[in-house]
Amino acid sequence: MRSTLRKDLIELFSQAGSEFISGQKISDALGCSRTAVWKHIEELRKEGYEVEAVRRKGYRLIKKPGKLSESEIRFGLKTEVMGQHLIYQDVISSTQKTAHELANNNAPEGTLVVADKQTAGRGRMSRVWHSQEGNGIWMSLILRPDIPLQKTPQLTLLAAVAVVQGIEAAAGIQTDIKWPNDILINGKKTVGILTEMQAEEDRVRSVIIGIGINVNQQSDDFPDELKDIATSLSQASGEKIDRAGVIQHILLCFEKRYRDYMTHGFTPIKLLWESYALGIGTNMRARTLNGTFYGKALGIDDEGVLLLETQEGIKKIYSADIELG
């Protein structure tokens, strides 16, 4: 079944609410035979949609699946590019790994890889990312920006802004950014962002943005070593959160910010990022591969590099683990 027809069929059911829609009306709306309509509905049932069929009345949608699915993500997605080419799998080793393979095979910009569970999810510096089934968002987005190599770190900050805005739009939850790639709620990590690049000499071939979000986890779902430092959107709101809705809003915000970035450069993103960032103007400790530095965070420069005012002068921090206070 073509994904566009599946999306259109779900939209028809949603518009009808609790009312039945005749097979002929669906057939006319989708431009296919009534036999094809039946086949399309059977495909939806396989995805977990509960569809009631009554002779001489037609069909109506009783219940959507509780699990994440390609159809749920596609339905209501208002982007033009981001996520329109979508690969969804229930279980995957790593969305980032699959996205790299797709990028190598000329997948178009905006291609999104989403999984309900990762068996080998990873974060920055090859750290393990705990990504269990049924509770989180694990996705990777392929970009093909025409920018110099040295500007690719800016896309991590752009992604962070889009995630903050998308979460607030989808769930009404305000979050903070901790440089460079963590999103926090009340000081606890909720989102991690991993940016990787494929390049040839001085040319960017693709940028892969990996985003992991703790959505519906409760305290007992986290390993003991994470319970005190991690949280989820559901824990913050006290409610179960629609994962597909969060994905849709993040993609829409990302598309808008990415368009701004490609048209107007990094300055609009920089201003937004600093408005959401924790620790600007306060002291922090930056642990880098070349040593640990302590000082006052002045903000980020025009390349997205953290500026730390230390006793020895202003230090540029390109990559580090940050400890606030």
From Swiss-Prot:
Keywords noted in UniProt: ATP-binding, Biotin, DNA-binding, Ligase, Nucleotide-binding, Repressor, Transcription, Transcription regulation
InterPro entries found in the cross-reference section: aa-tRNA-synth_II/BPL/LPL, Bifunct_BirA, Biotin_CoA_COase_ligase, Biotin_operon_repress_HTH, BPL_C, BPL_LPL_catalytic, HTH_11, Transcriptional_repressor_C
Superkingdom, natural source: Bacteria
PROSITE patterns on file: BPL_LPL_CATALYTIC
One Gene Ontology term from the biological process aspect of the record: regulation of DNA-templated transcription
Binding of biotin, residues: 118, 122-124, 189
DNA-binding region of this protein: 23-42
Purpose of the protein: Acts both as a biotin--[acetyl-CoA-carboxylase] ligase and a repressor.
Sequence similarity: Belongs to the biotin--protein ligase family.
Name this protein carries in UniProt: Bifunctional ligase/repressor BirA
